[in-house]
Swiss-Prot record:
HAMAP family tied to this protein: NDH1_NuoD
Pfam families the record matches: Complex1_49kDa
Function: NDH-1 shuttles electrons from NADH, via FMN and iron-sulfur (Fe-S) centers, to quinones in the respiratory chain. The immediate electron acceptor for the enzyme in this species is believed to be ubiquinone. Couples the redox reaction to proton translocation (for every two electrons transferred, four hydrogen ions are translocated across the cytoplasmic membrane), and thus conserves the redox energy in a proton gradient.
Protein name in the entry: NADH-quinone oxidoreductase subunit D
Keyword Manganese carried by entry: no
Gene assigned in the entry: nuoD
Originating organism: Leptospira borgpetersenii serovar Hardjo-bovis (strain L550)
Keyword Zinc-finger: no
Record text on subunit structure and interactions: NDH-1 is composed of 14 different subunits. Subunits NuoB, C, D, E, F, and G constitute the peripheral sector of the complex.
Subcellular location: Cell inner membrane
Enzyme Commission no: 7.1.1.-
NCBIfam families: PRK06075.1 (NF004739)
Membrane topology listed for this record: Peripheral membrane protein
Catalysed reaction, written as an equation: a quinone + NADH + 5 H(+)(in) = a quinol + NAD(+) + 4 H(+)(out)
Sequence similarity: Belongs to the complex I 49 kDa subunit family.
Length: 405
């Protein structure tokens, strides 16, 4: 899979197709791709003989931009990776920077970050499962969960001021403290989600037509999933028990009780089952945290890295100087390198940072889970039906913004 795959490449490779074979484009602008993705597929009747995936349509040079932006400015780039669950990207980046700076944040910050992380995970899974149903002709199922997704969006919008590009968190804390009704609204969302998930489960995962279109389709073995670099729900659906929250715990994930759902054959059905159960487990995590959010500060005492409150800037010379230094000179991260992995909705999201002690990183690399899934698409669909390739793509949940970065 390369950026250099041009029309000439495909013309040369497929100029002598066997009789009866046809070359078709699935994308880059097609309802089934859910983003700017292109798959060039060779078919014999309805059977897929070969497939090639093309990336780069949404490439925005984020890693290179990371060398020019300050550590806080790079948050706007993380917003535009997996834009379905933006706060998970923001938190992953901030945790990587805080590790390099050896910053300890108040427990209140960690609790809020974890609650928002799990709400974002639920939002992402709702999109994946709902759109999978739409692609297979079950439009009504999506509507049962999208109402609750909207309720989560409203919480995030109240907290951050935005729905998609949240730029949630800052180095050392949150952008702002939670609003007074935050805990109450989170509880109401969780209460409403529980029966909605079970209803959705009955509508789709107990439907004979849905089962016929997903069971045994687009499967991958545990060995091949590991070889391709799978992580997250797609890896666990193949039978591999690996979750960064459990195996390399961060924040307070080692203090909460939750189960890691595991599938068997890595098929579309098992990827759906894993995501369905993960939503239940996310609710379980949230309910353990929401009643115990500690009082106190919502950011660490970091005058050299965290912007002071506006009223202090206007009335205190020292605070004004800190404000000027952070804005004009940026946050200086000690020299060194660090890789921080978090469990995003699609899998292991990692940020590798090399610092030379300046306001901007010397090098940034993003380990985005979608990149590895997309490489496997040809193997997953080869020999299957063209219609099944749509279900396979949906179940992988490839987000173009994260794929190309």
């Amino acid at each position: 899979m390369m950026y250099e795959k041009t029309a000439e490449h495909f013309e040369q490779k497929y100029k002598n197709l066997p009789e009866g074979h046809l070359l078709v484009n699935l994308g880059p602008s097609h309802p089934a791709t859910h983003g700017i993705l292109q798959n060039v597929i060779q078919i014999d009747g309805e059977r897929i003989v070969e497939a090639e995936s093309v990336i780069g349509y949404v490439h925005r040079c984020f890693e290179k931009l990371g060398e020019r932006y300050t550590y806080n400015q790079f948050l706007v780039c993380t917003d535009r990776m997996n834009y379905v669950s933006t706060p998970l990207n923001n938190i992953g980046w901030i945790l990587a920077v805080e590790k390099m700076m050896q910053v300890e944040v108040p427990d209140r910050v960690t609790y809020v970050r974890m609650i928002i992380s799990e709400l974002s995970r639920i939002m992402d899974h709702i999109i994946c499962l709902g759109i999978l149903g739409v692609d297979l002709g079950a439009f009504s199922g999506m509507l049962h969960l999208f109402h609750h997704r909207e309720n989560i969006y409203q919480i995030i919008e109240k907290l951050t001021g935005a729905r998609l590009t949240t730029t949630f968190c800052r180095i050392g804390g949150l952008e702002r403290d939670i609003y007074p009704e935050f805990e109450k609204e989170v509880k109401l969302v969780c209460k409403g989600l529980k029966p909605a998930i079970e209803e959705f489960n009955s509508l789709l995962l107990k439907n004979k037509i849905f089962l016929g279109r997903t069971e045994g389709i687009g499967g991958i073995s545990a060995e091949n999933a590991i070889a391709y670099g799978f992580s997250g729900p797609n890896l666990r659906a193949a039978g591999v028990d690996w979750d960064v929250r459990k195996d390399k715990p961060y924040m307070l994930y080692d203090k909460v009780d939750f189960d890691v759902p595991i599938g068997e054959d890595g098929s579309v059905l098992h990827r759906s089952l894993v995501r369905m159960e993960e939503m239940r487990q996310s609710i379980r995590i949230i309910e353990q945290l929401v009643d115990g959010i500690p009082s106190g500060a919502w950011h660490a005492d970091l005058p050299h890295a965290y912007l002071p409150e506006k009223n202090k800037v206007y009335n205190n010379m020292e605070e004004l100087i800190y404000h000027f230094k952070i804005i004009m000179h940026g946050v200086k991260v000690p020299p060194g390198e660090h890789y921080m992995a978090t469990e995003a909705a699609n899998g292991e999201l990692g940020f590798y940072i090399i610092s030379e002690g300046e306001k901007s990183p010397w090098r940034v690399h993003v380990r985005r889970p979608c990149f590895w899934y997309y490489q496997s698409f040809a193997e997953l669909v080869r020999g299957g039906l063209l219609a099944d390739s749509v279900a396979t793509m949906s179940s992988l949940n490839v987000i173009a913004g994260e794929l190309d970065c």
